[in-house]
Curated annotation (Swiss-Prot):
Name by which UniProt lists this protein: Uronate isomerase
Reaction equations catalysed: D-glucuronate = D-fructuronate; aldehydo-D-galacturonate = keto-D-tagaturonate
PANTHER family: URONATE ISOMERASE (PTHR30068:SF4)
Family: Belongs to the metallo-dependent hydrolases superfamily. Uronate isomerase family.
Gene Ontology annotations of biological process type: D-galacturonate catabolic process; D-glucuronate catabolic process
Keywords: Isomerase
Entries under HAMAP family matching the protein: UxaC
Gene3D superfamilies per record: Metal-dependent hydrolases, uronate isomerase, domain 2, chain A
Pathway: Carbohydrate metabolism; pentose and glucuronate interconversion
UniProt xrefs under Pfam families: UxaC
Length: 466
């Protein structure tokens, strides 16, 4: 029997062990998509308890605690930190096969030097140990980032954000990790939302552009795009239920937007037409600026309306959406490509059955402007586990060039989540190691080592231009 999560965790062959320890583990981390708060980096926040770090905003953990019958008081409510931690420990012990079990113990090992197991029996001991560690100066936010060997972080930011904390970090010569903004304009696109006009007023204010038309909206966004670009932004991100393509004329789009400005009701088709025009318009801007466009889709959000009204968005009540088709995705990309304005694009679907469809779409739009110009994103959210990662990378290898893959990101709100890069790298090396030891690929360790370093780090650095 193998020891629990030892140095060769997830590595079953000698090739995998060599590739991980000698190559993948040696390169830094670029976390090009996450949801951490740049203010906490700028102020170098310290945490009082492990509960604050682990359970303060992690809806992955909250979902499992609810599945274990834990009262909301101990999840998002007013229970004490030790009570919440004990309830999480009770839950984690049952999470066999869940990536949270591995992630949590990787974090305990790497940041707290704890190589035991977290359970109901050990929860008090682990709580005290972690809190003692967190009281040390090197366990501040910046210390954790440096300890994790991170060299670049891209946060997630709205077009109206001031980016004041990014400015402060960039001016601080004592911290050499790049913390760059990433453009997330969902609120400017989602005209069906009840607070849409309020948002437009804020966008008008920060851009200095009157938004009385769709053309005006695009001009206001262009002003903000230029500002983000001046702050080092190189990537956009879009959260979509699915990638739609319902084209309309300029006159029709202006009429839809005018109706919404006047407080009118927008039909479902009008919403899709507007969003299509929006995505094509901003896609052209990304190409002009040399940015990467990320498309995250396949999500049905806020399904539990009762809890949404209590707790708000991003609290653990989302699921996979099966709407949409690869045809509309291809048509959207083709609309940009037809005018030679298709930017580098990373495509993520929350629905794992989309893997092969995405893999075939990629091959339709590759060209010589970039290696792997159109990418399939790493297994995301509900697929961010051992099975999901293996399935995504195997599908990508079957249909494209795995060696050109831009690899992993945390998509996290926690400063301890950089161990997810380690998790990914171990799984990557195990996958490739098995192929080699099964005689399916030559045992050229020099080339293989460079490949896993490329997927872990260098492909990303080149692709984004960091």
């Amino acid at each position: 029997m193998k020891p629990f999560m030892d140095k060769d965790f997830l590595l079953s062959t000698e090739t995998a062990k060599t590739l991980y320890h000698d190559y993948a583990a040696q390169v830094p981390i670029i976390d090009y998509h996450c949801h951490i708060n740049p203010e906490e980096i700028a102020k170098d926040r310290s945490f009082d308890t492990i509960t604050q770090v682990w359970l303060g905003g992690d809806h992955y953990k909250w979902r499992q605690m609810r599945s274990n019958g834990i009262d909301e008081k101990y999840i998002t409510g007013d229970a004490s930190d030790i009570e919440k931690f004990e309830k999480w420990a009770e839950t984690l012990q049952k999470a066999i096969g869940n990536p949270l079990y591995h992630w949590s113990h990787l974090e305990l090992q790497r940041y707290f030097d704890y190589y035991g197991t977290l359970s109901a029996k050990t929860s008090e001991e682990v709580f005290k140990l972690c809190n003692e560690k967190l009281s040390q100066p090197e366990m501040s936010v910046r210390g954790l980032i440096k300890e994790s060997n991170v060299d670049t972080i891209c946060t997630t930011d709205d077009p109206i954000d001031s980016l004041e904390w990014h400015k402060a970090i960039a001016k601080d010569s004592t911290f050499d990790v790049k913390v760059l903004p990433a453009w997330r304009p969902d609120k400017a696109m989602n005209l069906e939302k009840p607070d849409y006009l309020d948002y437009l007023a804020k966008l008008e204010s920060v851009s200095g552009v009157k938004i009385a038309s769709f053309a005006g909206l695009m001009e206001a966004l262009k002003v903000r795009l230029e500002f983000f670009n001046s702050m080092g932004c190189k990537v956009s991100d879009h959260a979509l239920s699915y990638v739609m393509y319902k084209p309309a004329t300029e006159e029709e789009i202006e009429a839809i937007f005018a109706k919404r400005l006047a407080g009118g009701t927008i039909s479902e088709m009008e919403e899709l037409q507007f969003k299509t025009a929006f995505m094509v318009s901003v896609g052209r801007e990304y190409n002009r600026l040399g940015w990467v466009m990320q498309l995250h889709y396949g999500t049905k959000r806020d399904n539990n309306v009762f809890r949404f009204n209590q707790l708000g968005a991003d609290t653990g009540f989302d699921c996979i959406n099966t709407e949409g088709s690869s045809a509309e995705l291809a048509n959207f990309l083709n609309a940009l490509n037809s005018s030679d304005e298709l930017p580098k694009t990373i495509i993520y679907s929350l629905n794992p059955t989309d893997n092969a469809a995405i893999g075939t779409v990629l091959g339709c739009f590759q060209d010589s402007t970039a290696v792997g110009k159109i990418q399939q994103g790493s297994a995301w959210w509900f697929n961010d586990n051992k099975t999901g990662m293996i399935d995504q990378m195997t599908s990508l290898a079957n249909l494209g060039l795995l060696a050109n893959f831009v690899g992993m990101l945390t998509d996290s709100r926690s400063f301890l989540s950089y161990t997810r890069h380690e998790y990914f790298r171990r799984i990557l090396c195990e996958l490739i190691g098995n192929w080699v030891e099964n005689g399916e690929y030559p045992n050229d360790i020099e080339f293989l080592g460079q490949m896993v370093q490329d997927i872990s780090y260098y492909n990303t650095k080149r692709y984004f231009g960091f």
